[in-house]
């Protein structure tokens, strides 16, 4: 078996996690108490969904995941929520006082006390696997726990499980919508560690997903539940081929191989189509070509970033439902002829496709319509550089005046860490510029030292 362990850190990580496990359970027909009437092999078996769920002798299915937060309220919602019987109590770990939006608290003072407990639980989950293929890590980098404890845990996972893949689903601060003043500090400090310790990071931001909810689903005032259910669809599409048997299956490590041209350039855009409300879906059924085009629309991106400002390096299309390879090839061929969608000249093929025959599932009473086919795209574009430039600019404005820095230093950080992280991101911006540079020959000389 190729098992995957999910790690949900901080409020954002946990709430996205809730939405994901809710959706997985619906997709596999697992009840909130972990029973699965359709499952004939009791106690394990080689069903594809065992990559994400382990089975007890009593036929209960337990998610292979942990929820981790420095304060109890969010984890308590899981402990008392609909799916409280699904999780083993040891999988839900919470501390007493939160990180207070402070990276240093999450990474040094408070995070340090809880991280060993978390690693201990992860070790138990890992021992329960026959062939662990990697970790999915869910966090946001604007707050204190997701950024500080998140990066601390990733660093420790690199030490303990060096060769295993780590995929991050990371919520970045949005350009306009802000939840904390010190977001730029936390995200820069955290990205510094993500650069080294994740293999692929899929970037998300709330503002982009708010806009999608407003525009495509006609939700006037989207809540986090609306956003998280949308994110869950994306993550479900990515992991569908690990959980179901399909025609063109995609392994976690395959994402890495196909999407990451250079180790540092591993931050991905994601999009999902079709996003339509139930009222509209009643009147239209979308073809493979239409949903493929929709996935490339700048407005479909789950992070505020316009791919037209850069070039694609690689792109992974995961189809599910009623889709055959012939349609996919035709759609991809059409995309390649479009002038607006440009690839770098050193990557001529650029597409990796996966097909899974399990049609998309929707949460009953949710916003999304039940459709016959859907596609999720993860792409590596040079335009992602603009997200980092935006963050760095905000960081610089504050750091020039050393505003708020004393809070971090007071928790045991050194000022040198700020400048080190900032220099690392400056180098990253430069990497993006070089990769997008016009010709492959010109870039060749400069890149010799770098990689």
Curated annotation (Swiss-Prot):
UniProt GO BP = microtubule-based process
Listed GO CC annotations: cytoplasm; microtubule
Per UniProt, what is the name of the gene that codes for the protein in this document? TUBA1
Kindly provide the PTM information from the record.
Undergoes a tyrosination/detyrosination cycle, the cyclic removal and re-addition of a C-terminal tyrosine residue by the enzymes tubulin tyrosine carboxypeptidase (TTCP) and tubulin tyrosine ligase (TTL), respectively.
| PROSITE patterns associated with the record | TUBULIN
Source organism of this protein record: Chlamydomonas reinhardtii (Chlamydomonas smithii)
* Cofactor section: Mg(2+)
**What reaction does this enzyme carry out catalytically?**
GTP + H2O = GDP + phosphate + H(+)
GO terms of molecular function? GTP binding; hydrolase activity; metal ion binding; structural constituent of cytoskeleton
Q: Where does GTP bind?
A: 11, 71, 144-145, 179, 206, 228
* PTM-bearing positions, type N6-acetyllysine: 40
Q: What is the protein name stated in its UniProt record?
A: Tubulin alpha-1 chain
Protein role = Tubulin is the major constituent of microtubules, a cylinder consisting of laterally associated linear protofilaments composed of alpha- and beta-tubulin heterodimers. Microtubules grow by the addition of GTP-tubulin dimers to the microtubule end, where a stabilizing cap forms. Below the cap, tubulin dimers are in GDP-bound state, owing to GTPase activity of alpha-tubulin.
Site positions (Involved in polymerization) are 451
| One Pfam entry name | Tubulin
Oligomer status and interactors: Dimer of alpha and beta chains. A typical microtubule is a hollow water-filled tube with an outer diameter of 25 nm and an inner diameter of 15 nM. Alpha-beta heterodimers associate head-to-tail to form protofilaments running lengthwise along the microtubule wall with the beta-tubulin subunit facing the microtubule plus end conferring a structural polarity. Microtubules usually have 13 protofilaments but different protofilament numbers can be found in some organisms and specialized cells.
């Amino acid at each position: 078996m190729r098992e995957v362990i999910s790690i949900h850190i901080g409020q954002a990580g946990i709430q996205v996690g809730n939405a994901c496990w809710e959706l997985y359970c619906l997709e596999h027909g697992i009840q909130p108490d972990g029973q699965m009437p359709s499952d004939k092999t009791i106690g394990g078996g080689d069903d594809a969904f065992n990559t994400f769920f382990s089975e007890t002798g009593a036929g209960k299915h337990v998610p292979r995941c942990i929820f981790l937060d420095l304060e109890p309220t969010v984890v308590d919602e899981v402990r008392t929520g609909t799916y409280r019987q699904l999780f083993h109590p040891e999988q839900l770990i919470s501390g007493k006082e939160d990180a207070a939006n402070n990276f240093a608290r999450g990474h040094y003072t408070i995070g340090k006390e809880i991280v060993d407990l978390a690693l201990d639980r992860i070790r138990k989950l890992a021992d329960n696997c026959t062939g662990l293929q990697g970790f999915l890590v869910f966090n946001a980098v604007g707050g204190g726990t997701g950024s500080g404890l998140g990066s601390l845990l990733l660093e420790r996972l690199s030490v303990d499980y060096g060769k295993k893949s780590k995929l991050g689903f990371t919520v970045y601060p949005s350009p306009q919508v802000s939840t904390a003043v010190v977001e730029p500090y936390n995200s820069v400090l955290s990205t510094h560690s993500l650069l080294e310790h994740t293999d692929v990071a899929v970037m998300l931001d709330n503002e982009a997903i708010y806009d999608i909810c407003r525009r495509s689903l006609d939700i006037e005032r989207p809540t986090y539940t609306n956003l998280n259910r949308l994110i869950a669809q994306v993550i479900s599409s990515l992991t569908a081929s690990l959980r179901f048997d399909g025609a063109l299956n995609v392994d976690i490590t395959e994402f890495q191989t196909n999407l990451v041209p250079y180790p540092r350039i591993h931050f991905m855009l994601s999009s999902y189509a079709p996003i339509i409300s139930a009222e509209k879906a009643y009147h239209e059924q979308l073809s493979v070509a239409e949903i493929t085009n929709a996935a490339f629309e700048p407005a479909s991106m789950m992070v505020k970033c316009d791919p037209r400002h850069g070039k694609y390096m690689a792109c992974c299309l995961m189809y599910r439902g009623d889709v055959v390879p012939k349609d996919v090839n035709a759609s991809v061929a059409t995309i390649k002829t479009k002038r607006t969608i440009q690839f770098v000249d050193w990557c001529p093929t650029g597409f990796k496709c996966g097909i899974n025959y399990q049609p998309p599932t929707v949460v009953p009473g949710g916003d999304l319509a039940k459709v016959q086919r859907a596609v999720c795209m993860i792409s590596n574009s040079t335009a992602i550089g603009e997200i980092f430039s935006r963050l760095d600019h905000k960081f610089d404005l504050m750091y020039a005046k050393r505003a708020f820095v004393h809070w971090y230093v007071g928790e045991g950080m050194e000022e040198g860490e700020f400048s080190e992280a900032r220099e690392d991101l400056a180098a990253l911006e430069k990497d993006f510029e070089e990769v997008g540079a016009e010709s492959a020959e010109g870039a060749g000389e400069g890149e010799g030292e770098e990689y």
